[in-house]
């Protein structure tokens, strides 16, 4: 697919794709994914052509931007590494997120509370999001998917070849698609203007690690504040003024002093 010059892959974006290991595919190759293989390494890992990955990112963004109502785009991720990216993508583009387990009947059973009628479905992995793709095929909804070299391609209309198992790779692909959608909608004025949102925002973060870091920060703050409080008490505390002449006199002592010995 030939793109206009303004849509060419920039060196900065190419570095991001390589740094996030987007080009490292699986060792097995599904027959429909062979055109996306650049070469096979001696260890058996198939290297993905990032140029074709970029072409599919632009194509997917143009399809998403062509839908008038942004909420008619459903973005799904059963895979844990893609759930944060899906939620951030929905927040920035206005799409409808389905993060976590996909409830069977979301697209086909109108009696359920979670029933949806999207015009487009975007999934993180065709293997883990098979239920969403299967139901989309029943009701004729086009599907865009992030596909690895061993991912099934049945009922997938647009495949974005990439490493869909790494948290950095998944987050970066969703970030690039969101940025292209905002550019096509005119929210980002031109292609020379940088998006203020960093790719790190789309990366998966372990909740236990976040909680542990927060606990360590609290402990560090307590340790730093405690000596300061002690020093303030020691050097700036005021001592009570005591009149020793009055404090030493008791009624018994005064009576003894007044008596005639």
UniProtKB/Swiss-Prot annotation:
Origin organism is Debaryomyces hansenii (strain ATCC 36239 / CBS 767 / BCRC 21394 / JCM 1990 / NBRC 0083 / IGC 2968)
Function, in words: Required for the assembly and/or stability of the 40S ribosomal subunit. Required for the processing of the 20S rRNA-precursor to mature 18S rRNA in a late step of the maturation of 40S ribosomal subunits.
Q: Where is the composition biased (Acidic residues)?
A: 222-244
Could you cite one Gene Ontology molecular function of this protein? structural constituent of ribosome
Q: Give the record's subunit note.
A: Component of the small ribosomal subunit. Mature ribosomes consist of a small (40S) and a large (60S) subunit. The 40S subunit contains about 33 different proteins and 1 molecule of RNA (18S). The 60S subunit contains about 49 different proteins and 3 molecules of RNA (25S, 5.8S and 5S). Interacts with RPS21.
Keywords in alphabetical order? Acetylation, Cytoplasm, Ribonucleoprotein, Ribosomal protein
Q: Where in the cell is it found?
A: Cytoplasm
Q: Which SUPFAM superfamilies match?
A: Ribosomal protein S2
A GO CC term attached to the entry: cytosolic small ribosomal subunit
Protein family: Belongs to the universal ribosomal protein uS2 family.
Q: What ranges does the record list as Low complexity composition bias?
A: 245-261
Q: Which residues cross the membrane?
A: none
Q: What is this protein called?
A: Small ribosomal subunit protein uS2
Q: Which residues carry this modification: N-acetylserine?
A: 2
Q: Name one GO biological process term.
A: translation
Where is region (Disordered) located? 214-261
Pfam families in the record, alphabetically?
Ribosomal_S2
Taxonomic superkingdom:
Eukaryota
């Amino acid at each position: 697919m030939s793109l206009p010059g303004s849509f060419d892959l920039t060196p900065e974006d190419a570095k991001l794709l390589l740094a996030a290991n987007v080009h490292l595919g699986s060792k097995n190759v599904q027959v429909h994914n062979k055109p996306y293989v650049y070469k096979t390494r001696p260890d058996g890992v198939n290297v993905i052509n990032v140029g074709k990955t970029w072409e599919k990112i632009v194509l997917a963004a143009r399809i998403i931007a062509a839908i008038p109502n942004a909420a008619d785009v459903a973005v799904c991720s059963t895979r844990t590494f893609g759930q944060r990216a899906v939620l951030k993508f929905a927040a920035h583009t206005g799409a409808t997120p389905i993060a976590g387990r996909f409830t069977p009947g979301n697209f086909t059973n109108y009696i359920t509370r979670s029933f949806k009628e999207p015009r487009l479905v975007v999934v993180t992995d065709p293997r883990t999001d098979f239920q969403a793709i299967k139901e989309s095929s029943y009701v004729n909804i086009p599907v865009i998917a992030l596909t690895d070299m061993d991912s099934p391609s049945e009922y997938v209309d647009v495949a974005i070849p990439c490493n869909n198992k790494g948290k950095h790779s998944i987050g970066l692909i969703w970030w690039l698609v969101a940025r292209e959608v905002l550019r096509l909608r005119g929210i980002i004025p031109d292609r020379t203007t940088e998006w203020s949102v960093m790719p790190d925002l789309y990366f998966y973060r372990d909740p236990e690690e976040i909680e542990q870091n927060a606990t360590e920060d609290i402990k560090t703050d307590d340790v730093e504040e405690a000596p300061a409080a002690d020093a303030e008490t020691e050097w700036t505390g005021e001592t009570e003024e005591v009149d020793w002449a009055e404090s030493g006199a008791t009624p018994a002592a005064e009576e003894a002093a007044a008596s005639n010995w």
